[in-house]
Design a protein with these regions (language model features):
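Absolute protein N-terminus
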Residues: 1-3
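Compact, glycine-rich, soluble single-domain proteins
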Residues: 6-47, 51-57
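C-terminal structural segments of small proteins and small subunits
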Residues: 55-88
Length: 88
């Protein structure tokens, strides 16, 4: 399963939200990947996420595969759409 979402928090996917993303992705048995401009990274790897340099307004695709893929995808989308809990 996959869905495109846009990073909405002011500071983009810097260290704190990236660590939140990894922590959330690691809760699932399914694989979770981020895709940006053709580059695909494991969303359970903070280094992978950080190397993408995702700023506010960047569109990414979240892809999940596995037994809990729907729950994983919905949870990851919710995290991004809520701006990782940062004030807007």
């Amino acid at each position: 399963m996959e869905k495109k979402v846009t990073i909405i928090n002011e500071t983009g996917l810097h260290a704190r939200p990236a660590s939140m993303f990894v922590k959330k992705a690691s809760e699932f048995k399914s694989s979770v990947e981020l895709i940006h401009e053709g580059e695909r990274v494991n969303a359970k790897s903070i280094m992978g996420i950080m190397k993408l340099g995702l700023a506010k307004g960047t569109e990414i695709t979240i892809e999940t595969k596995g037994e809990d893929e729907e729950l994983a995808l919905n949870s990851m989308i919710e995290l991004v759409e809520n701006g990782f809990g940062e004030k807007k």
